[in-house]
């Protein structure tokens, strides 16, 4: 019953595709509250440059929680410049141990153009097996489409755009207004 009185924020599909020496991270722009679209142009994919080392991050879940995690990730990257995996593991440790952070409801996809990682709400750090990963409400649709498109000769950005379009056609919490960031090592 409480869910009916306080509907949750829904939405977001974030997809990352690694191919040909680059990683493309794409995210849709829809933010929904219950059955209502609140915003269609949110930017859920960001470029970070802590210590001069470029990183692209996409987030799903609570926006405030995601920004908290992005800020902490930037601090971890400043402490370990150029060591994305180490910074993510340190963030995951904090996420699991800190009383406040444990309650954050967000997931991140992060990449430096070489390493591609997913940070889950449980404090896990996962490296995708097939050079493709996705999170959010339409994540499974985008992931399936992108994995199918990996069998083609399409470049990473085109795979990401086509897969996100498929996810937007299927998931009511995902739209076709994309933010796309490319990064290579």
Curated annotation (Swiss-Prot):
Residue pairs linked by disulfide bridges in the UniProt entry = none
Task: Cite the binding residues for Na(+).
Answer: 168, 171, 174
**Which enzyme type, at the first EC level?**
hydrolase
Biological process (GO) annotations held by this record are: proteolysis involved in protein catabolic process
The alphabetized UniProt keywords are: Allosteric enzyme, Cytoplasm, Hydrolase, Metal-binding, Protease, Sodium, Threonine protease
Question: Catalyzes what?
Answer: ATP-dependent cleavage of peptide bonds with broad specificity
Compartments (UniProt record): Cytoplasm
Q: Where is the active site?
A: 12
Pfam families recorded for this chain? Proteasome (PF00227)
Query: Quaternary arrangement and interactors, per the entry?
Result: A double ring-shaped homohexamer of HslV is capped on each side by a ring-shaped HslU homohexamer. The assembly of the HslU/HslV complex is dependent on binding of ATP.
Q: What is this protein called?
A: ATP-dependent protease subunit HslV
Gene name, per UniProt, is: hslV
